[in-house]
């Protein structure tokens, strides 16, 4: 094991000089062996020549000084994997941070791995029911697929994510891995207690690298979580992998890239944006042995979907759930935009003709309503034809019926959460489209589960 000395420190970036004949490889983990920060891990990012390597620190560099001895471990960062990680909260290095003692003697794996080869990969078209009406209807998820939840600040990405985890973990009863990448510590804490109260904590591994962590931690924590998910997949399981938030992964890459002295590209992002995203996303794949279904929250800066970060993420996904500020401002939650959200599964050969026709019918009615909004604003409803009046009335009912009370929001709303099966979702929307509920007031459709509840609610109004 070779030893080197710290020669330069620039924020989270540390340069270390090794003997010329034993320079560490790219991605090798190095460890500080003396001083206040003994045990601090550094990851090699560049070889500068002359025996000097440039590393990124996975922890604070406050108190680091030149001349300290550094050991080369000779391998990439190794994190614990397997059943010992379930029910535990870990940091980027796999160390427990939940004060529940050490993680049992388990297998360790490198966080840097190759993506599965073409021969090993498998594609499935089996649907994953989420119990959330708008998602199951308009942008259905595939088992083993990749889903992105896109939204600006405060439109409900994390709440939607928590509801999906709760519904799928309880109904699907598989293992899940949750990677908290650069999000609020409070949300991580809420999430832990939510899982504990729902009695699904023993099926979830939690890996956190929160907002206050150095950029190295936030950049690598997604890979740590992914490695744990890959292990479950390779054991032949169907595993769920949740990332909140993919944008912070990109942002950490931007910070690291600037510190490493690379020229920034568009909007100040790193020049390697597409490649860094690809390295992560290509590993999130299903193989012939098991599947990884991944659900990722994607922050959209300034609500601009054409920003390079969300735009790069779009290319990798099978389904996109777009959360809209306009819909949230109407008080309709989940604030999913049914006209902007897409899914590759929305195909009659996959979901069946009835589901497809209902989804497209809902979209066309909502699209017509959107087109008529200007006319209504200027001339009022009375100027519309009878047909258009009916369309608008149905569209407003559909819009309200797309809302749904969440289990994870019970404490705030006071109304119990609802899980709606796909069959009930389709029959409800089909009924509205066919005019079976034209006589009910539109308020009856707001924040209910199935269509029967809307009919019950109408009787009390």
From Swiss-Prot:
A single MF term (Gene Ontology): proton-transporting ATP synthase activity, rotational mechanism
CDD domains cross-referenced by the UniProt entry: ATP-synt_F1_beta_C, ATP-synt_F1_beta_N, F1-ATPase_beta_CD
Gene3D superfamilies reported for this sequence: 2.40.10.170, Bovine Mitochondrial F1-atpase, Atp Synthase Beta Chain, Chain D, domain 3, P-loop containing nucleotide triphosphate hydrolases
Predominant place of localization: membrane
Alphabetical UniProt keywords: ATP synthesis, ATP-binding, Cell inner membrane, Cell membrane, CF(1), Hydrogen ion transport, Ion transport, Membrane, Nucleotide-binding, Translocase, Transport
Residue stretches spanning the membrane: none
Record's subcellular location: Cell inner membrane
An example Gene Ontology CC term for this record: plasma membrane
Catalytic activity: ATP + H2O + 4 H(+)(in) = ADP + phosphate + 5 H(+)(out)
Entry-linked InterPro entries: AAA+_ATPase (IPR003593), ATP-synt_VA_C (IPR055190), ATP_synth_F1_bsu (IPR005722), ATPase_a/bsu_AS (IPR020003), ATPase_alpha/beta_chains (IPR050053), ATPase_F1/V1/A1_a/bsu_N (IPR004100), ATPase_F1/V1/A1_a/bsu_N_sf (IPR036121), ATPase_F1/V1/A1_a/bsu_nucl-bd (IPR000194)
UniProt-annotated binding residues for ATP: 151-158
EC number: 7.1.2.2
Stored Pfam families: ATP-synt_ab (PF00006), ATP-synt_ab_N (PF02874), ATP-synt_VA_C (PF22919)
Bilayer topology: Peripheral membrane protein
Family in the record: Belongs to the ATPase alpha/beta chains family.
Quaternary organization: F-type ATPases have 2 components, CF(1) - the catalytic core - and CF(0) - the membrane proton channel. CF(1) has five subunits: alpha(3), beta(3), gamma(1), delta(1), epsilon(1). CF(0) has three main subunits: a(1), b(2) and c(9-12). The alpha and beta chains form an alternating ring which encloses part of the gamma chain. CF(1) is attached to CF(0) by a central stalk formed by the gamma and epsilon chains, while a peripheral stalk is formed by the delta and b chains.
Biological role: Produces ATP from ADP in the presence of a proton gradient across the membrane. The catalytic sites are hosted primarily by the beta subunits.
UniProt-recorded name of the protein: ATP synthase subunit beta 2
């Amino acid at each position: 094991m070779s030893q080197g000395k710290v020669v330069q420190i620039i924020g989270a970036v540390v340069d270390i000089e090794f003997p010329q004949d034993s320079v560490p490889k790219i991605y090798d983990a190095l460890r500080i062996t003396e001083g206040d920060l003994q045990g601090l891990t550094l990851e090699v990012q560049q070889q500068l020549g002359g025996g000097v390597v440039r590393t990124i620190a996975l922890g604070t560099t406050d108190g680091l000084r030149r001349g300290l001895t550094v050991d080369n471990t000779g391998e990439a960062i190794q994190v614990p994997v397997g059943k010992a990680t379930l029910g535990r909260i870990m940091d980027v290095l796999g160390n427990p941070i939940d004060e529940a003692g050490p993680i049992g003697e388990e297998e360790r794996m490198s966080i840097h791995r190759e993506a599965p080869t073409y021969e090993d990969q498998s594609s499935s078209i089996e649907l994953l029911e989420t119990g959330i009406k708008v998602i199951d209807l308009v942008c259905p998820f595939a088992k083993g697929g990749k889903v992105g939840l896109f939204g600006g600040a405060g439109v409900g990405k994390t709440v939607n994510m928590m509801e999906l985890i709760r519904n799928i973990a309880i109904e699907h009863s598989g293992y899940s891995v949750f990677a908290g990448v650069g999000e609020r510590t409070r949300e991580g804490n809420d999430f832990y207690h939510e899982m504990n109260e729902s009695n699904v904590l023993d099926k979830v591994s939690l890996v956190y690298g929160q907002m206050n962590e150095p950029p190295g931690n936030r950049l690598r924590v997604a890979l740590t979580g992914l490695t744990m998910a890959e292990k479950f997949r390779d054991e032949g399981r169907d595993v769920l992998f949740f990332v909140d938030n993919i944008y912070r992964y990109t942002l950490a890459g931007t910070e690291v890239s600037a510190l490493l002295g690379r020229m920034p590209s568009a909007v100040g992002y790193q020049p390697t944006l597409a490649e860094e995203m690809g390295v992560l996303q290509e590993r999130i794949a299903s193989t012939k042995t098991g599947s990884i279904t991944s659900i990722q929250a994607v922050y959209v800066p300034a609500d601009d979907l054409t920003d390079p970060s969300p735009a790069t993420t779009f290319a990798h996904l099978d389904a996109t759930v777009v959360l809209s500020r306009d819909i949230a401002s109407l008080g309709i939650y989940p604030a999913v935009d049914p006209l902007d959200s897409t899914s590759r599964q929305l195909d009659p050969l996959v979901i069946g003709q009835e589901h497809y026709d209902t989804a497209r019918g809902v979209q066309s009615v909502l699209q017509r309503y959107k087109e008529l909004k200007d006319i209504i604003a200027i001339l009022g409803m009375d100027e519309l034809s009878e047909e258009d009046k009916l369309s608008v009335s149905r569209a407003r009912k559909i819009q309200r019926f797309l809302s749904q009370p969440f289990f994870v929001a019970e404490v705030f709303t006071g109304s119990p959460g609802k899980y709606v099966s796909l069959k009930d979702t389709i029959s409800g929307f089909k009924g509205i489209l066919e005019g079976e509920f034209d006589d009910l007031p539109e308020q009856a459709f707001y924040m209910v589960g199935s269509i029967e509840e809307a009919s019950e609610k109408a009787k009390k109004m």
